[in-house]
Amino acid sequence: LMEDEVYDSHMVGQKDDVDDGRNMLLSEGDRMVAIVDKSEKKVKGRNFAYEVNGLKIFAMGADYIPEDNILTRQNRARTDLLLLSAQESHFNTLRVWGGGYFLDDFFYDICDERGLLIWHDFMFACASYELSNHFEENVSIEIRQNVRRLRSHASIALWCGNNELETQYENLSWPQTRKQYYDYIRLYEYLIPKLVKEEDPEKFYWPSSPSSGGNFENSNAENIGDTHYWGVWHG
């Protein structure tokens, strides 16, 4: 994808016409991204594709996982080199994997500058999360804070609830309770999409990866939504 025009906005907090010391610099772009998710007349299944400024594109890229197990060794120069390599390899998309963490601002700034799209998981992966009032409140704060921090970035194309949880519930033979299913639906198909709609209503939300749209319905279908091909690991 072509590089975005990125505009910086400097915001200063005031109270009673006096600067209160709060300053914020936001980077914004003019890219319009939609997700085409609709039935096709000529084939069995549904489209699932990026549409950028009205043009449907083929997503090419990779998962982005933490660059180093020692997080303090990560810096802007190192990330810039990695994302330059992605751009020069003709990537147009990166998926921020839900088994990692919410990244520093400079990662998103560089993606804005290099015209890379981000499929952004929330930080839930490969586990069953039991809800309590305290945990739900903690999750809500985390989602709100990070969506508010990142929503102005032109690179953010999609918010996704989790990595591989729906398909694990559907296909793995681990002990499962009715409460686990209830908590899953409440967290990824009610609470998080509700928060995203409140904080970033123009962005598309997808409940899990892979998924056919949620509710444990053939989550890794090859002709609906997105799919994970695990055969790359074990043939």
What would you call each of these model-derived segments?
Residues 96-113, 118-235:
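Substrate-binding/catalytic cleft of secreted carbohydrate-active enzymes
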